[in-house]
């Protein structure tokens, strides 16, 4: 956002969108702080992308999928680098072909071990995947499952205190792939549904989205990410 601002973009922060309507070939975006006219709109609102989509008559199949993080006390160096188990990917994609030998609660809450040290000598423990609407409250049962899985890989963690937990929401799609696409509503684009990969994929998403809006051919095949794959029953 700061880079875009340097190029002349105007940021309008903490300004809720209340509605979108057509005015000729342009959109009029109704916000809490007035109206904004735009030729094109990119819906990059993550778990709230469906809310914006409904304003132009689109049903965007994105759900909120909650994930929790545990934060340890300051302690000795348990590990120097980030570690995650293969189960992180199988839980994300809900693989039927691979089942881990894990406890019922680890399986129930989509828990997979992720460890990340910090510069302050705390460490972060993840991860979980549950459907809880837009609830971002931490669950003690999920925390227990995450601690159980962490101790399975690093037994020393059993002797280290957890000082807090927090949760966030990932934008989930039925086929676990993002939507990076134009739509039947001319000038309305979607860039959402990346689930836990949004930060890492943001540069390439921005590049191909800019190409689409400019009428240029993206350098890669985006057909697997098209919005209409859901309408066609392909997902």
Regions found by a protein language model. Give the residues of each.
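Helix-loop-beta segment of a Rossmann-like dinucleotide-binding subdomain
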Residues: 1-7, 28, 128-132, 185-187, ...
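Active-site catalytic microenvironments for nucleophilic, acid-base chemistry
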Residues: 3-7, 51, 55, 212-216
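Helical element adjacent to the flavin cofactor pocket in flavoenzyme catalytic cores
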Residues: 1-39
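Active-site substrate-recognition segment that forms the wall
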Residues: 19, 35-36, 46-165, 169-184
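N-terminal Rossmann-like NAD(P) cofactor-binding module of classical short-chain dehydrogenase/reductase
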Residues: 42
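A generic structural signal for beta-strand entry/edge sites
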Residues: 24-28, 120-122, 188
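Beta-strand segments within the central parallel beta-sheet cores of soluble alpha/beta enzyme folds
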Residues: 14-17, 161-163, 222-227
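C-terminal lid/capping helical subdomain adjacent to the catalytic/cofactor pocket in oxidative enzymes
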Residues: 9, 177-235
């Amino acid at each position: 956002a700061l880079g875009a601002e340097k190029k002349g973009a105007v940021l309008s922060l903490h300004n809720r969108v209340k509605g979108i309507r057509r005015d000729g070939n342009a959109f009029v975006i109704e916000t809490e702080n007035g109206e904004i006219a735009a030729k094109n709109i990119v819906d990059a609102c993550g778990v709230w992308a469906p809310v914006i989509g409904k304003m132009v008559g689109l049903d965007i199949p994105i759900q909120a999928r909650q994930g929790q993080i545990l934060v340890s006390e300051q302690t000795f160096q348990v590990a120097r680098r980030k570690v995650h188990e293969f189960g992180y990917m199988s839980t994300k994609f809900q693989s039927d072909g691979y089942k881990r030998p894990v406890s019922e609660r680890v399986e129930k809450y989509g828990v997979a071990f992720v460890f990340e040290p910090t510069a302050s000598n705390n460490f972060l423990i993840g991860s979980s995947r549950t459907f809880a609407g837009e609830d971002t409250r931490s669950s003690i049962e999920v925390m227990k499952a995450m601690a159980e899985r962490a101790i399975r890989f690093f037994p020393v963690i059993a002797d280290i205190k957890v000082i807090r937990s927090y949760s966030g929401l990932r934008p989930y799609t039925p086929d676990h792939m993002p939507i990076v696409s134009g739509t039947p509503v001319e000038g309305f684009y979607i860039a959402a549904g990346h689930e836990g990969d949004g930060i890492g994929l943001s540069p390439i998403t921005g590049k191909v989205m800019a190409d689409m809006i400019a009428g240029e051919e993206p350098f890669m095949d985006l057909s697997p990410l098209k919005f209409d794959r859901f309408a066609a029953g392909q997902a």
